Amino acid sequence: MSDLTDIQEDITRHEQQLIVARQKLKDAERAVEVDPDDVNKNTLQARQQTVSALEDKLADYKRRMADAVSRKKMDTKPTDPTGIEPDDHLKERSSLRYGNVLDVNAIDIEEPSGQTADWYTIGVYVIGFTLPIILKALYMLSTRGRQTVKENKGTRIRFKDDTSFEDINGIRRPKHLYVSMPTAQSTMKAEELTPGRFRTIVCGLFPTQIQVRNIMSPVMGVIGFSFFVKDWSERIREFMEKECPFIKPEVKPGTPAQEIEMLKRNKIYFMQRQDVLDKNHVADIDKLIDYAASGDPTSPDNIDSPNAPWVFACAPDRCPPTCIYVAGMAELGAFFSILQDMRNTIMASKTVGTAEEKLKKKSSFYQSYLRRTQSMGIQLDQRIILLFMLEWGKEMVDHFHLGDDMDPELRGLAQALIDQKVKEISNQEPLKI
């Protein structure tokens, strides 16, 4: 009984501390709105962390209280001599022992799964902001994404920029862009922006602006994306003119050979793919595309558009909804995700370690991309991905950045100098450069 009393006292004490901390947080938020200097911002951040820590502790104490009550009930319950729980439906005891009781009260099954998002609501929300704050937030979540996520994990952050404001009764107030930084256990709402959803929607809406400012995710930089896109118009034009191995045109006797060759081109296969996509539209995504078309966004309407590959410059985790019905676009994103997996496999293969350690360094970008994109209502055409790989795979692998650009002869000379100097000053074994 004393344990329950102690836990209850801890809960009461932490609830009181949480009330005070939340009030201090409100005061800090008001102070930042009035005077957004570094001191006030640091105070706000510290108080947010305090509130978060108290909430976590309080939740932990409540869980401990529930466990203690459950344990007390179990202790007072008469034991069945057969070893079967009273509410178990088995007539004879299972060969397995009874394990933990999983409490599912906190789970809301009305919430969507992690693969589902309300793209129309998300798109309307993002388009409502000025372009500078959108692109700056994209930079923070792509080029500097790893650092931003690491520093803010488990919180809902707000991006602020002087270009983003709203007038309320003649008073100019900042209009913050909210992005949630979930942990592995977080449940996201359908309309909630996460870094992955933000990159997906912004890349699909503003590829031209991303191209002009050369905003790029590091994972795309290391697979040679800059090299790939520099002559995109010429590259895709040549690709479309080549013969497609998956087309066998039905031609009438006497058809000119030149016309038969025209019917075997990749361009014809892409036209057939476009016909398939035109029959598989989803209403919400159509609404988003129509809404975007009425504003400034620059979504590509064809894969040979100059800005088409820039849709994937910031490594969205799926094909953006604004170009999912453009033949070849979803497959181009899948091609990039395979290249990321290929590079990571090469990097894992060349490292020293056990087979298990090497496997941990491999990635599954392609499987994740495939699953997320197909959850939006389309099936990817694996043949198009194969065509891309046959056409550009070897060239792209040759342009991977593998973190080992030093000339072998230069490396050997540098290592010899290191070995010599280490032997002069110590009896330790020299390290490898």
UniProtKB/Swiss-Prot annotation:
Record-stated family:
Belongs to the hantavirus nucleocapsid protein family.
**Function statement:** Encapsidates the genome protecting it from nucleases. The encapsidated genomic RNA is termed the nucleocapsid (NC) and serves as template for transcription and replication. The nucleocapsid has a left-handed helical structure. As a trimer, specifically binds and acts as a chaperone to unwind the panhandle structure formed by the viral RNA (vRNA) termini. Involved in the transcription and replication initiation of vRNA by mediating primer annealing. Plays a role in cap snatching by sequestering capped RNAs in P bodies for use by the viral RdRp during transcription initiation.
Alphabetic keyword roster:
Capsid protein, Chaperone, Coiled coil, Endonuclease, Helical capsid protein, Host cytoplasm, Host Golgi apparatus, Hydrolase, Nuclease, Ribonucleoprotein, RNA-binding, Viral nucleoprotein, Virion
* Annotated segments matching region Chaperone activity: 1-100
In this chain, the stretch annotated as Viral panhandle binding covers 1-175
Report which gene this protein is encoded by: N
**What is the E.C. number?**
3.1.-.-
**Which domain of life does this protein belong to?**
Viruses
Stretch list, region Interaction with host DAXX? 377-433
Q: Where is it located?
A: Virion; Host cytoplasm, Host perinuclear region; Host Golgi apparatus, Host cis-Golgi network
Looking at the record, which segments are called Homomultimerization? 1-79, 100-125, 377-425
Enumerate the residue ranges of region (RdRP binding).
1-50
Query: What is the name of this protein?
Result: Nucleoprotein
Q: Where is this region: Viral RNA-binding?
A: 175-217
Gene Ontology MF terms: endonuclease activity; RNA binding
Start and end residues of each stretch annotated as Interaction with glycoprotein N: 80-248
Short motif (YxxL): ranges:
178-181
Q: Which residues does the annotated region (Interaction with host RPS19) include? A: 150-175
Species of provenance: Puumala virus (strain Sotkamo/V-2969/81)
Annotated site residues (Important for the endonuclease activity) in this chain: 88, 103
Q: Where is the composition biased (Basic and acidic residues)?
A: 67-78
Q: What subunit structure does UniProt give?
A: Homotrimer. Homomultimer. Homomultimerizes and binds to viral genomic RNA to form the nucleocapsid. Interacts with host MAP1LC3B; this interaction participates to the protection of Gn from virus-triggered autophagy. Interacts with host SNAP29; this interaction participates to the protection of glycoprotein N from virus-triggered autophagy. Interacts (via N-terminus) with host RPS19; this interaction probably mediates the loading of the 40S ribosomal subunit on viral capped mRNA during N-mediated translation initiation. Interacts with the viral RdRp. Interacts with host SUMO1 (via N-terminus).
| Annotated domain remarks | The N-terminus is required for chaperone activity and, in trimeric form, this region likely serves in high affinity vRNA panhandle recognition. The N-terminus also contains a coiled coil region, which probably participates in but is insufficient to initiate N trimerization. The YxxL motif is indispensable for the interaction with host MAP1LC3B. The central region is involved in specific RNA-binding. Has distinct cap- and RNA-binding sites so it can bind simultaneously both the vRNA and mRNA cap.
Where in this chain does the entry annotate a coiled-coil region? 4-71
Any matching Pfam family: Hanta_nucleocap
InterPro entries in alphabetical order = Hanta_nucleocap
